[in-house]
Swiss-Prot record:
It comes from Pyrococcus furiosus (strain ATCC 43587 / DSM 3638 / JCM 8422 / Vc1). This is Adenosylhomocysteinase. One of its GO terms (biological process) is one-carbon metabolic process. Belongs to the adenosylhomocysteinase family. Signal peptide: none annotated. It is found in: Cytoplasm. It catalyses: S-adenosyl-L-homocysteine + H2O = L-homocysteine + adenosine. Pathway: Amino-acid biosynthesis; L-homocysteine biosynthesis; L-homocysteine from S-adenosyl-L-homocysteine: step 1/1. HAMAP family: AdoHcyase (MF_00563). May play a key role in the regulation of the intracellular concentration of adenosylhomocysteine.
Length: 421
């Protein structure tokens, strides 16, 4: 462990390799490049302190460097103990970001490092799962008056924050970046869809075609996972609790059944619900020998490991990121990435082109909080549509795509009520 006054990383000497990764992904993130140039010129965050809890890998690093380019003092800690890339955080430390993260850090270190990131007494918090915002409300209440607001990247985090708002304990405004069109329509669907299977295939080196894939949850992440599984040649089964989403999955061409029925026939199970104990003892007991389980939800609670451990007579690790649970009857069940985010633990997370849009929204959310915090209430907000559209237009422009524009006559027609049959 290599720790100094403003950082704690595995090894600072890894920085050069980290810079190579950051440089590579930045070439495929034109929207964030555009915003970085804008921030470098205008310095909107001069004198502003920003603390972030994120998956500390190469795309996230480019976001943090973009905020720093805008004049911010930036600190960061990991939002998952297993998603940190040690070479990338070394590069961030060298660049002057106050960063505290080590891949494989303990639960105690996880919160210790988060406290260190908060020691800058931030004006803005950028969160991924709402752990940092929750920690401030529970243990660092003395700094609440200095916090203008925060932003949240994930579905899971937004659920937690809305619960805080409903309970009347949220003390500052938070932007639900996850709920922006340019986030959930692309990041949650196309990003999660591709990166989840990237992680599963890297971890197992197994064929997907011909297998029964059970996708638990048919939100935007589940949609993407199911879509890509079908594209890889799998028979896809969706498990849902929402009757509308279940019907949608069936109309999309997927089989739909409850978890007990799916447990009997699934070869690969992927959870994406944001909820607890979605796959548990009663389901493990029904699974076939060799069944593989992976989680694409934020926390490691969707596949209930305590039940697996109680059922197992032997636990082994046949491959990196694969845990084998041998049961009394001889069956072997496999859990990938210790039940944590398989796309970030066993692979590199979402593609750069996808995170380009999500992190452009995060950068603009921070600027929006800085400019508007005095009039915002302690509630969960969605970014204005014009910011969504700005990100979309820059992305289209970078792809060489020109779209149609409404004529004045068409605009007038859409704004009128007189025209009928």
């Amino acid at each position: 462990m290599d720790c100094g006054k403003d950082y704690c990383v595995k090894d600072l000497s890894l920085a050069e390799e980290g810079w190579k990764k950051i440089d590579w992904v930045s070439r495929f993130m034109p929207v964030l490049q555009y915003i970085k140039r804008e921030f470098e010129e205008k310095k909107p965050f001069k004198g502003v302190r920003i603390a972030a809890t994120l998956h500390l890998e190469m795309k996230t690093a480019f976001l943090l460097l973009t905020l720093k380019a805008g004049g911010a003092e930036v600190s960061a800690a990991a939002s998952n103990p297993l998603s940190t890339q040690d070479d990338v955080v070394a590069a961030l430390a060298k660049a002057g970001v106050k960063v505290y993260a080590i891949r494989g850090e303990s639960r105690e270190q996880y919160y210790e490092f988060m406290h260190k990131a908060l020691d800058i007494r931030p004006n803005i918090i950028i969160d991924d799962g709402a752990d940092m915002i929750s920690l401030v409300h529970k243990e660092r209440q003395e700094m609440l008056d200095e916090i203008w607001g925060g932003s949240e990247e994930t579905t899971t985090g937004v659920i937690r924050l809305r619960a805080m708002e409903k309970a009347g304990i949220l003390k500052f405004p938070v932007i639900a970046v996850n709920d922006s069109y340019m986030k959930y329509l692309f990041d949650n669907r196309y990003g999660t869809g591709q990166s989840t299977w990237d992680g599963i295939m890297r971890a197992t080196n197994l064929l997907i075609a011909g297998k029964n894939v059970v996708v638990v949850g048919y939100g935007w992440c589940g949609r993407g996972i199911a879509m890509r599984a079908r594209g890889l040649g799998a028979t896809v089964i969706v498990v849902e609790v929402d009757p509308i989403k279940a019907l949608e999955a069936r109309m999309d061409g997927f089989l739909v059944m409850d978890m007990k029925e799916a447990a009997k026939i699934g070869d690969i199970f992927v959870t994406a619900t944001g909820n607890i104990k979605c796959i548990r003892r009663e389901h493990f007991e029904l699974m076939k020998d060799g069944a593989i389980m992976a989680n694409a939800g934020h926390f490691d609670v969707e596949i209930w490991k305590p039940d697996l451990e109680k059922l197992a007579v032997e636990i082994n690790n046949p491959r990196p990121n694969v845990t084998e649970y041998k049961l009394k009857d001889g069956r072997r069940l496999y859990l990938l990435a210790d039940g944590r985010l398989v796309n970030l633990v066993a692979a590199d997370g979402h593609p750069a082109e996808i995170m380009d849009m999500s992190f452009a929204l995060q950068a603009k959310a921070a600027e929006y909080i800085k400019d508007n915090h005095e009039r915002l209430e302690p509630k969960v907000y969605i970014l204005p549509r014009e910011i969504d559209e700005m990100v979309a237009r820059i992305k289209l422009e970078s792809m060489g795509i020109k779209i149609e524009e409404l004529t004045e006559e068409q605009k007038k027609y859409l704004e009128s009520w007189e025209h009928g049959t």
